[in-house]
Amino acid sequence: MKKAILATKIGMTQIFNENGVLTPVTVLQAGPCAVTQVKTVDNDGYAAVQVGFGDIRETLVNKPQKGHFAKAGVANKRFLKEFRFENAADYTVGQEIKVDIFTAGDKIDATGTSKGKGFQGAIKRHGLSRGPMGHGSKFHRHAGSNGAATTPGRVFKGKHMPGQMGNVKVTVQNLEVVKIDVDNNLILVKGAVPGPKKAMIMLKETVKSGK
């Protein structure tokens, strides 16, 4: 069975192992989640597991969602996300998913929405080199040339230019699970995960071996 769970980001801290080596970790509140729907190739064209996380009061749920949760026999949830698994049939509607599906040492992928930085210049957005900062220079933090003249007569797609930075879907792969706290539904992951505090993060076992 493929392992996956929804979590919210609490923040970062650091811990020491038995050898005194410091490790930066991200603390996540993972689950408990509920399976609200199991999609199959025959009925939906693809196999996936729909998971709900975070109980909310009934007044925050619209009528179609109320019916959906009632049909699954679960409480109203704040977040609903799908995990596409070939073996989705291993899950059952109403099943509870807890953080103990993972163990210390597992490798997981974390998907979330990165922090929005607003409209930024090309140097901050893409890491371009700046020009001379001397008094006589007329080129400080410009992006430089964005193309030739008549030929090709256009700016190529993907050219590094100023624009909206951040607030996009990001997946960080092969993160190591450092510690599991089953009693408090906490999972400690080595390194950073996308998004600000309280952001919703999708955690699933890694798709790459990392070798």
Curated annotation (Swiss-Prot):
<dbReference type="InterPro" id="IPR019926">
    <property type="entry name" value="Ribosomal_uL3_CS"/>
</dbReference>
<dbReference type="GO" id="GO:0006412">
    <property type="term" value="P:translation"/>
</dbReference>
<comment type="subunit">
    <text>Part of the 50S ribosomal subunit. Forms a cluster with proteins L14 and L19.</text>
</comment>
<comment type="function">
    <text>One of the primary rRNA binding proteins, it binds directly near the 3'-end of the 23S rRNA, where it nucleates assembly of the 50S subunit.</text>
</comment>
<protein>
    <recommendedName>
        <fullName>Large ribosomal subunit protein uL3</fullName>
    </recommendedName>
</protein>
<keyword id="KW-0687">Ribonucleoprotein</keyword>
<dbReference type="InterPro" id="IPR000597">
    <property type="entry name" value="Ribosomal_uL3"/>
</dbReference>
<keyword id="KW-0689">Ribosomal protein</keyword>
<dbReference type="InterPro" id="IPR009000">
    <property type="entry name" value="Transl_B-barrel_sf"/>
</dbReference>
<keyword id="KW-0694">RNA-binding</keyword>
<dbReference type="GO" id="GO:0022625">
    <property type="term" value="C:cytosolic large ribosomal subunit"/>
</dbReference>
<keyword id="KW-0699">rRNA-binding</keyword>
<dbReference type="Pfam" id="PF00297">
    <property type="entry name" value="Ribosomal_L3"/>
</dbReference>
<dbReference type="GO" id="GO:0003735">
    <property type="term" value="F:structural constituent of ribosome"/>
</dbReference>
<comment type="similarity">
    <text>Belongs to the universal ribosomal protein uL3 family.</text>
</comment>
<dbReference type="GO" id="GO:0019843">
    <property type="term" value="F:rRNA binding"/>
</dbReference>
<dbReference type="InterPro" id="IPR019927">
    <property type="entry name" value="Ribosomal_uL3_bac/org-type"/>
</dbReference>
